């Protein structure tokens, strides 16, 4: 939903820099022989030659359009050179283009606040740079103006008959009677032209730009004169730009809102909105949206340049059109594994290079039912807390898909059964990681994010579970079907400052394009138990004991820890009888000392504190597996998997002293 923001009172200078057919330029730099030839970059897709994602200007002159497929492009322009996007994991690999885009951003960011909007476009706030230039070297004082500056297109610029275009631009820029707004724009024209020249020199890429007083107008202007040119929108020319602009061309009006304006109010251009009062628009679309519509009709936008060089999210997706649509859960899982692997690599790179970690994993998909024209309902998106590591992301992505599938098919009154999707087809899959935050300073090693460290999630003041939470999605049963609190990115000594909540899949926003705050909600669960570990050495053999104590704090932990967390980080070898007797003797002696003497407070208090925990050990062979049947299915699977692992690990490592310690008391008795 659009958000109405008041425009800054002071004049701003905002530029939108857009690379010219960027993918083609990247390939031309790699293969210089393609320069000057009609060429295009095609997606990885064998069907009809693949879809075009970038078309050179030479190919456009031959009638080739980006909406075409490779075979169509060759029919329209037989001499066209088609270059396929690099492939990895059976899908397009865009890392080459991302890296090239980063080269451009590193150059543009030197001029002021910079916001990377996509692989090939950037917003710049040049207000400070323009004000400095206006104070030190105003345009009217310049004797020489660069040729690139004089090529600028200035909307609303008056030209006398017979005047040279470049001379008219010079006169507009150097006006002494211009108001402050226009003088700042003149400085912006000079700054942007120099930046574009620098980008061309260092990267061999051309770019176009729009220069205006806000992001909205700059974005509209950047595409008006391509390639390798820049367009300026002075304040006086705003209405000229917007009066004839189709309503669907305006950002955020290309969907349902724009359609509603056309059908309900008869609005075809942005200028048509001027006939409606702010109150009238608010009556139709609410206070916030109504005010936003009233503002954009007048070229008003207070949206700030965010000063962000790094992406807000990472994603990986693939479409399966026509006969390539997925027909079984196994093929869906295969492709989710591929997408998750790519996403994991990008997250790991971001973590290593930028010290950032993502908080939320989201799955999007599209589906339809063959021979059913009424089946094109939106496939619900699902989100859960982010866990790092390829296997974990793959597992969570598939669980999210299954939850979404149950909800989607449930809307038709159908329950999914078996591996086959029957008449259903999946035509698109994507996984994304969002809500990315910086890692707090003082973190000893980022590799901790890839290590499983079982910690009990704590609860913040607002009741949210803190820490990365592993979970298995359920559509109909909500969070209670399967739950785990294995923390995958825990750093005990550092608070990451990120709060996560377990998702409730029954109350999720189904907007595929956004991960909203309501996508992830808190799930009630049982009180957690704090498990502490002690270790000591005896007769050259290191053993570990498990201490179990209740937390007396007023703030109780939430979340149901996996039962395997209690066992998996401890040595399964029980303490010897001698050790147990020695511990018991020390415990009793320390208690008696506490009651009989106060002269040794320091030593005795320490011993009493140690004796408050009841020590116990266990031996995996003594666990009665018949009691497993009384446990939830999820815990049964975890325990059996754990015991198999420990049995292999401990083979041949018995002490041979016959000492045993039972854990049977941990389980309720089995009624036979």
Curated annotation (Swiss-Prot):
Subcellular localization: Nucleus
Residues of the UmuC domain: 14-254
Protein activity control: The enzyme in complex with the DNA substrate binds a third divalent metal cation. The binding of this third divalent cation, which is coordinated by water molecules and two oxygen atoms from DNA and dNTP, is essential for catalyzing the DNA synthesis.
Major subcellular site: nucleus
Stretches the record annotates as Disordered: 521-617, 648-672
Protein name: DNA polymerase eta
Residue sites binding Mn(2+) 1 per the record: 18-19, 120
Compositional bias ranges of the Low complexity kind: 587-602, 651-662
Organism (species): Arabidopsis thaliana (Mouse-ear cress)
Matches recorded under PANTHER family: DNA POLYMERASE ETA
Keyword terms of this UniProt record: DNA damage, DNA repair, DNA replication, DNA synthesis, DNA-binding, DNA-directed DNA polymerase, Magnesium, Manganese, Metal-binding, Mutator protein, Nucleotidyltransferase, Nucleus, Schiff base, Transferase
Annotated residues for binding of Mg(2+) 1: 18-19, 120
């Amino acid at each position: 939903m659009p958000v109405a923001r008041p425009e800054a009172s002071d004049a701003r200078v905002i530029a939108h820099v857009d690379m010219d057919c960027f993918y083609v330029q990247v390939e031309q730099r790699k293969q210089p022989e393609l320069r000057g030839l009609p060429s295009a970059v095609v997606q990885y897709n064998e069907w009809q030659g693949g879809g075009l994602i970038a078309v050179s200007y030479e190919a456009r002159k031959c009638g080739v359009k980006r909406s075409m497929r490779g075979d169509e492009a060759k029919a329209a322009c037989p001499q066209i050179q088609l270059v396929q996007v690099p492939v990895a994991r059976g899908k397009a690999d865009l890392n080459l283009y991302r890296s090239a885009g980063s080269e451009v951003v590193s150059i543009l960011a030197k001029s002021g606040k910079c916001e990377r909007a996509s692989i090939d476009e950037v917003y710049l706030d040049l207000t400070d740079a323009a004000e400095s230039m206006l104070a030190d070297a105003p345009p009217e004082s310049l004797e020489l103006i660069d040729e690139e500056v004089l090529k600028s297109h200035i909307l609303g610029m008056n030209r006398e008959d017979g005047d040279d275009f470049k001379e008219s631009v010079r006169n507009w820029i150097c006006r002494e009677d211009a108001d402050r707004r226009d003088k700042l724009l003149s400085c912006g024209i000079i700054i942007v032209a120099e930046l574009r020249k620098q980008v061309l020199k260092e990267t061999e890429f051309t770019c176009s730009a729009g220069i205006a007083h806000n992001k909205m107008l700059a974005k509209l202007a950047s595409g008006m004169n391509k390639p390798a040119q820049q367009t300026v929108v002075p304040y006086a020319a705003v209405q000229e730009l917007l009066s004839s602009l189709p309503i669907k061309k305006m950002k955020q009006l290309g969907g349902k809102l724009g359609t509603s304006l056309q059908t309900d109010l008869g609005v075809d251009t942005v200028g048509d909105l001027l006939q409606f009062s702010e109150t009238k628009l608010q009556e139709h679309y609410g206070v916030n949206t109504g005010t936003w519509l009233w503002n954009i009709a007048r070229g008003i936008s207070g949206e700030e340049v965010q000063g962000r060089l790094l992406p807000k999210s990472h994603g990986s997706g693939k479409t399966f059109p026509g006969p390539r649509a997925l027909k079984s859960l196994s093929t869906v899982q295969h492709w989710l594994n591929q997408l998750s692997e790519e996403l994991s690599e990008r997250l790991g790179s971001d973590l290593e290079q930028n010290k950032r970690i993502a908080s939320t994993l989201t799955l999007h998909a599209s589906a339809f039912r063959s021979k059913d024209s009424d089946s094109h309902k939106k496939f619900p998106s699902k989100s859960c807390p982010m866990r790092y590591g390829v296997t974990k992301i793959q597992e969570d992505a598939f669980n999210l898909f299954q939850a979404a599938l149950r909800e989607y098919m449930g809307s038709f009154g159908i329950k999914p059964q078996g591996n086959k999707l029957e008449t259903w087809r999946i035509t698109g899959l994507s996984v994304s990681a969002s809500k990315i935050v910086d890692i707090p300073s003082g973190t000893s090693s980022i590799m901790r994010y890839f290590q499983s460290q079982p910690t009990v999630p704590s609860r913040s003041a607002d009741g949210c579970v803190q820490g990365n939470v592993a979970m298995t999605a359920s559509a109909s049963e909500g969070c209670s079907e399967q739950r785990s609190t294995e923390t995958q990115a825990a750093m005990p000594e550092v608070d990451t400052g990120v709060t996560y909540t377990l998702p409730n899949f029954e109350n999720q926003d189904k907007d595929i394009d956004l991960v909203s705050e309501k996508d992830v909600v808190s799930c009630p669960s049982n009180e957690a138990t704090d498990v502490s570990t002690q270790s000591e050495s005896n007769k050259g053999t290191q053993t570990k004991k498990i201490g179990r104590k209740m937390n007396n704090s007023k703030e109780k932990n939430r979340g149901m820890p996996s039962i395997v967390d209690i066992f998996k980080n401890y040595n399964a070898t029980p303490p010897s009888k001698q050790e147990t007797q020695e511990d018991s003797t020390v415990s009793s002696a320390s208690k008696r000392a506490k009651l009989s003497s106060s002269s040794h407070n320091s030593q005795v208090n320490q011993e009493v504190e140690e004796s408050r925990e009841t020590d116990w050990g266990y031996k995996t062979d003594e666990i009665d597996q018949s009691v497993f049947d009384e446990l939830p299915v999820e815990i049964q699977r975890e325990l059996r998997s754990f015991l198999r692992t420990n049995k292999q690990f401990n083979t041949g490592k018995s002490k041979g002293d016959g000492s045993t310690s039972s854990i049977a008391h941990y389980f309720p008795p089995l009624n036979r």
